[in-house]
């Protein structure tokens, strides 16, 4: 595991976008060789998406041969609702790049058979050859996607009933009316993300500092689902300075001392970055 500590959230967005760009360009995708990317929603990845759009507009990266799989979607929320994850992804990322809509995969929370929808999503990931790089953010309680505290660490894509804390946290997106927040969602499982060849976790803000501490300084615990990625052979966590407030001083010093190695992860012409991310 690598922990990349950067000064601000803006640097997290820029650094992570450079890393994703390098991974895709080094992969050299083409008509018979697609790069498969797992993507999150929420405020945390917005800086990543803005920078990837910028790099695309500058001609530094193409998404023509990239397939994407999103982490989650609300149940019974129309696709064109401003808080649906379909709307979020198209508004904040997909419509600004050259990705083919047929290569975009987002769970359908309005499917007539939700279980079948989840199973089909897993099948599509397998048919695509698995996910090369899965990007995620976490909540203050360490959840990833809608895998909330207590979720199985080998779970697959499924229907989840949302916890009261999640409903209360998300009410701000629905006019602070908790009755309007969807009570269920479709989500990839922890096991689904663990199957990816590489996992990148973005952590921003002091309110997520305790979750980062649980993620890297304590043991694997299903009450902190992000901790599962300690056991992934290629995990890279990228955080801002505020998110390190609960870490031990020696932990922060250790990872900051590796900053020269971390810079090589986004340098042109550097070797297979996954070898540097163990």
Curated annotation (Swiss-Prot):
CDD domains: GlcN6P_deaminase. Pathway: Nucleotide-sugar biosynthesis; UDP-N-acetyl-alpha-D-glucosamine biosynthesis; alpha-D-glucosamine 6-phosphate from D-fructose 6-phosphate: step 1/1. Keywords: Carbohydrate metabolism, Cytoplasm, Hydrolase. It holds the Pfam family Glucosamine_iso. One of its GO terms (biological process) is generation of precursor metabolites and energy. GO terms for cellular component: cytoplasm. Catalyzes the reversible conversion of alpha-D-glucosamine 6-phosphate (GlcN-6P) into beta-D-fructose 6-phosphate (Fru-6P) and ammonium ion, a regulatory reaction step in de novo uridine diphosphate-N-acetyl-alpha-D-glucosamine (UDP-GlcNAc) biosynthesis via hexosamine pathway. Homohexamer. PANTHER family: GLUCOSAMINE-6-PHOSPHATE ISOMERASE. HAMAP family: GlcN6P_deamin. This is Glucosamine-6-phosphate deaminase. The gene is Gnpda1.
């Amino acid at each position: 595991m690598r922990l990349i500590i950067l000064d601000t959230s803006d640097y997290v967005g820029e650094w992570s976008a450079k890393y994703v760009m390098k991974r895709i360009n080094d992969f050299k995708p083409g008509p018979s060789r697609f790069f498969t990317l797992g993507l999150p929603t929420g405020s945390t990845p917005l800086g990543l998406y803005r920078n990837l759009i910028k790099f695309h507009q500058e001609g530094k990266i193409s998404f023509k041969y990239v397939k994407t799989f999103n982490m989650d979607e609300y149940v019974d929320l129309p696709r064109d609702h401003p808080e649906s994850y379909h709307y979020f992804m198209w508004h904040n990322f997909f419509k600004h790049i050259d990705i083919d809509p047929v290569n975009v995969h987002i769970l359908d929370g309005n499917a007539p058979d939700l279980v079948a929808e989840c199973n089909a999503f897993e099948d599509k990931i397998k048919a695509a050859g698995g996910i090369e790089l899965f990007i995620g953010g976490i909540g203050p309680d360490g959840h990833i996607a809608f895998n909330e505290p207590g979720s199985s660490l080998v779970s697959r894509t499924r229907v989840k009933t949302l916890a009261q804390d999640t409903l209360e946290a998300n009410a701000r997106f629905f006019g602070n009316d908790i009755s309007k927040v969807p009570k269920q969602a479709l989500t990839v499982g922890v096991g689904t993300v663990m199957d990816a060849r590489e996992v990148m976790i973005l952590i921003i803000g002091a309110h997520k500092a305790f979750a980062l501490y649980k993620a890297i300084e304590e043991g694997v615990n299903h009450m902190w689902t992000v901790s599962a990625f300690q056991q992934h052979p290629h995990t890279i966590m990228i955080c801002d300075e505020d998110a390190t407030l609960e870490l031990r001083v020696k932990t922060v010093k250790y990872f900051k001392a590796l900053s020269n190695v971390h810079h090589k992860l986004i340098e042109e012409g550097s070797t297979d970055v996954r070898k540097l991310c163990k």
